[in-house]
């Protein structure tokens, strides 16, 4: 069985973070492991508190994983401090990690910054160049490229600039301002659009975590990047189409929409 590792924060409500990652990886047929960067107290209406892991303990988690069950792919989500980013970069380099997918979580849905300036600098200098693919949304792509994105042409220019700057593939996720659910993958000097139909579901908590984890899962199984993106988009469409409705805010998706078997009912 292929394996995948998520390095991210814990979401106590189960809709995003490592909880969403583990569900996604399991649903996509790989064995999921996790290294936790932070504990959060949150639900569908917001985050009330964050308890950050120490660099030493994060390093211990990564050592424990890589020296026993080596991951076939690695997904990195929100990492809030430069010290933790340094630790991750050091360990991934030491263990020669492969198929690294970075979801550069930098901006909250409200538009507020989630990372301090030193953390942004560490992220861009140390983690992004290690990635096989980055998965920024529109606001994050604007930060990484230094460009304003208001249409498809702007999305193409920014995605191309990010790919050239960090030497990796970039999947820029539409949907924030343009293109409905169309995403743009840029790599090796060329761009490819992945078209998707917008699903009228207000419960979208954890969509970014889910997409990047699904891509990592398919890379772990040996799929090429284009196929991994196609399958990840199909999976997240299924999660949204299941129309799960939980909580008082923007609720979680149904990561196990396709789960069948004798243990499900009852």
What are these regions (language model features)?
Residues 49-52, 226-266:
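Charged C-terminal helix
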Residues 142-143, 201-225:
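Short, small-residue alpha-helix embedded
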Residues 117-191:
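Conserved phosphate/ATP/ADP-binding segment of small-molecule kinases
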Residues 14-30:
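N-terminal basic/disordered segments at the start of proteins
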Residues 7-13, 191-205:
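Short pre-catalytic strand/loop immediately N-terminal to key active-site residues, enriched for Gly-Thr
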Residues 29-33, 192, 218-232:
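Phosphate-handling active-site elements
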Residues 3-6, 26-109:
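Conserved N-terminal subdomain of the carbohydrate kinase-like
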